[in-house]
Amino acid sequence: MEQKFIKIFDGLKRDYGYAEITNGYKDSTTGKFKVKHGWAGKQLTSADYLEHLKGEKSIGIQPCDDNGMVSFGAIDIDSKAYQDFSPRKYLEIIEKNNLPVVPVRSKSGGLHLYVHTKEKVKASFLRNFLDKLLYTLE
């Protein structure tokens, strides 16, 4: 499973994002779950992926490699009032339009929509697709 996950989320290798989810808190104004996050400052390894899959650490892969190519991308669907956010509206639009995305509930309570390609494409191409997708969902 680990190797398949690495292949599906193949992106920047020289660095990766992290989030300290065990030290998070809920923002009293927005209801959003907030965590300390940033760049790890080191190369991504198979061990990092495995620890992520085991739930031992939270990592974020930058989709764009050093050549400006991607095999996946994501958009974040958020609400200003997280406690009132319901993904149902978006899931219905995705299903009705047979959109090629994988919806995943985010740590903060929003929704991430992932799109994957069979081969690497220019990041700008996928970014344009995601922008149009976001417009469709609003």
Describe the function of each predicted region:
Residues Q62-G68, E95-K96, V102-K107:
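Short glycine/proline-enriched loop/turn "hinge" motifs that connect secondary-structure elements
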Residues N23, N67, N97-N98, N128:
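Detector for Asparagine
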Residues E56, I94, G110-L111:
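Generic alpha-helix detector with strongest preference for long hydrophobic helices that associate
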Residues M1-F72, K80-Y90:
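DNA replication initiation on ssDNA origins
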Residues A74-I75, P100-L126:
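Histidine-centered divalent-metal-coordination microenvironment in nucleic-acid enzymes
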Residues Q83-K96, H116-E138:
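Helical (often loop-to-helix) elements that flank the catalytic cores of nucleotide-handling enzymes
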